[in-house]
Amino acid sequence: MSSGDFGNPLRKFKLVFLGEQSVGKTSLITRFMYDSFDNTYQATIGIDFLSKTMYLEDRTVRLQLWDTAGQERFRSLIPSYIRDSTVAVVVYDITNTNSFHQTSKWIDDVRTERGSDVIIMLVGNKTDLSDKRQVSTEEGERKAKELNVMFIETSAKAGYNVKQLFRRVAAALPGMDSTENKPSEDMQEVVLKDSPNETKDPEGGCAC
C-alpha cells in the first residue's frame, strides 16, 4: 500500500470507451495518456486498460480507462465492463454517419447496465477531417440533448479538445459537485497534470 493510501485514499473512477470500430477510441486515450498519435491503425483486441492520475483543484483522482473493441465479435464482453463504470465515453466518427447512428445503441446498452447512475459523454471525433464531415456539430448537440448526455467534438490526431474532454468528465464525477454545474468554458480552470507513475495493463491489447 502506498503512502497516499493512508488517511486520504485515492478515489478511483472507471471510464469505459465505447463505439464502432475505427472511430478513434484508442487514439483518444493515447493522446490523453502520452500526448501522441499513431497514424497506423490497429484494431483493439478485446479490452485494453490504462490508468492515469488527475489533479483536480483540491483533490486527486485515479481514472481507470477501459478501451473496448468495436468489432462485433467482442460485443459480448462489453456489458460486464459497463456494469461497474462511473463514466461511459461513447465515440463516433464525424465522417461516418453510421457510427453516429450507432451511438444510440451504445447509450442504450449503458443505461441497460447502469440505469441513470452513470455519466455519459458523447464524443464526435476526427474534427481534423472537417472536409469529409458527414455529421454536423448541431446534429451531435441535438442528439446529446435528446438523450440527456454530455457532448464534445475532438480530434485525437490534432489533440483538439482531448484534455477538455477529460476535464469535463472529471468535473462531473461524484464528489465534484462544486465544479459540476460550472459553465463549460470555466472547465479550463481545472488543473490537469501528468502522473509520474502511469500504468498499463501488461495483458492489454494494442496501444495504438
UniProtKB/Swiss-Prot annotation:
SS bonds (residue pairs): none
Binding-site residues for GTP, renumbered to this chain: 19-27, 67-71, 125-128, 155-157
Keywords attached to this entry: Actin-binding, ER-Golgi transport, Golgi apparatus, GTP-binding, Membrane, Nucleotide-binding, Synapse, Transport
Compartmental location: Golgi apparatus membrane; Synapse; Perikaryon
Tissue specificity of this protein: Expressed in larval eye, wing and leg imaginal disks and in salivary gland. Expressed in the larval optic lobe, showing an enrichment in the neuropil. In the adult brain, expressed in photoreceptors and mushroom body.
Annotated region described as Disordered, given as residue ranges: 176-208
GO MF annotations in UniProt: actin binding; GTP binding; GTPase activity
Single GO cellular component term: Golgi apparatus
GO biological process: axon guidance; compound eye morphogenesis; exocytosis; germarium-derived egg chamber formation; intra-Golgi vesicle-mediated transport; intracellular protein transport; oocyte microtubule cytoskeleton polarization; phototransduction
SMART domains with a match to the protein in the record: RAB, RAN, RAS, RHO
Domain of life: Eukaryota
Effect of a null allele: Larval lethal.
NCBIfam families with a match to the protein in the record: small_GTP
Subunit structure: Interacts with Rich and Act5C. Interacts with BicD (via C-terminal domain). Interacts (in GTP-bound) with GCC1/CG10703 and cbs. Interacts with Gorab (via C-terminus); binds to a Gorab homodimer, this interaction seems to be required for trans-Golgi localization of Gorab.
Protein name listed in UniProt: Ras-related protein Rab6
Organism per entry: Drosophila melanogaster (Fruit fly)
Gene: Rab6
